């Protein structure tokens, strides 16, 4: 399967709010700050074996930047950022960009479907009821100290092991999650904000990656 190559934006999750349509309908949206996405490197087939654009987002103190990275950023003429993200794109699109160029929210348009990737909120060590929606045991009537246990996790000597993938207690959350086909409800070009319909992974202040949707659904009845 060929990987879809498209340019995206790095952003910060500001939080959730709601907006109203002209008809008065309330739409829950997540506000994403995508300001100051700056190009730090253009990778080409001749120099790197593939075509991509490296983007920096956020800011970082000079004292917290390693010397190799400082030299890399100085070559591009950009300030250090919290994150360096690489987007694989077509060669003709890469030719339109240059080091130091700023990619703004006008990369997208209202109504466009996007995929948003982030790190989900960590929940710590959780049991199977919270982690996998297991049912609990009976509260009484013959049940003694087995109210929230997950049950059997395997068999006896044959096979003599717990099968991989068995749903058990463990660390919940703090995983990379991608939510697909979210619609851009509004774009605030002045403040460099994207308002995306629905929820996106992560806590307030978390970093997210916004890219054009790879599984856009065809309009029903369209030819």
Curated annotation (Swiss-Prot):
InterPro entries: Ribosomal_uL3, Ribosomal_uL3_bac/org-type, Ribosomal_uL3_CS, Transl_B-barrel_sf
List of residues that carry N5-methylglutamine: 157
Organism: Burkholderia pseudomallei (strain 1106a)
Protein name (record): Large ribosomal subunit protein uL3
Record-level GO cellular component terms: cytosolic large ribosomal subunit
Keyword Ribosomal protein: yes
Subunit-structure text: Part of the 50S ribosomal subunit. Forms a cluster with proteins L14 and L19.
Function of the protein: One of the primary rRNA binding proteins, it binds directly near the 3'-end of the 23S rRNA, where it nucleates assembly of the 50S subunit.
Keywords attached to this entry: Methylation, Ribonucleoprotein, Ribosomal protein, RNA-binding, rRNA-binding
PROSITE patterns: RIBOSOMAL_L3
GO biological process: translation
Family of this protein: Belongs to the universal ribosomal protein uL3 family.
Post-translational modification: Methylated by PrmB.
MF terms (GO), sorted A to Z: rRNA binding; structural constituent of ribosome
Domain of life of the native organism: Bacteria
Pfam families from the UniProt entry: Ribosomal_L3
Chain positions covered by the region annotation Disordered: 137-157
């Amino acid at each position: 399967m060929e990987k879809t190559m498209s340019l995206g934006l790095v952003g910060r999750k500001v939080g959730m709010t709601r907006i109203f349509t002209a008809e008065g309908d309330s739409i829950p949206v997540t506000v994403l700050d995508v300001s100051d996405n700056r190009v730090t490197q253009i990778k080409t087939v001749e120099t790197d074996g593939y075509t991509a654009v490296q983007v920096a987002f956020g800011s970082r103190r000079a004292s917290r930047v390693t010397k190799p990275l400082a030299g890399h950023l100085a070559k591009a003429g950009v300030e250090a950022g919290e994150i360096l993200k690489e987007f694989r794109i077509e060669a003709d699109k890469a030719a339109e960009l240059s080091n130091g160029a700023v990619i703004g929210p006008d990369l997208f348009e209202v109504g466009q479907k996007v995929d948003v990737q982030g790190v989900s909120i960590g929940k710590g060590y959780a049991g199977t009821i919270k982690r996998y929606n297991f049912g609990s045991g009976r509260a009484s009537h013959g049940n003694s100290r087995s109210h929230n246990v997950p049950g059997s996790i395997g068999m006896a000597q044959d096979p003599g092991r717990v099968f991989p993938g068995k749903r058990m207690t463990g660390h919940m959350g703090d995983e990379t999650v991608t939510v697909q086909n979210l619609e851009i409800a509004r774009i605030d070009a002045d403040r460099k904000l994207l308002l995306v319909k629905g929820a996106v992974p992560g806590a307030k202040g978390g970093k997210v990656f916004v890219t054009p949707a790879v599984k856009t659904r065809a309009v029903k009845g369209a030819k």
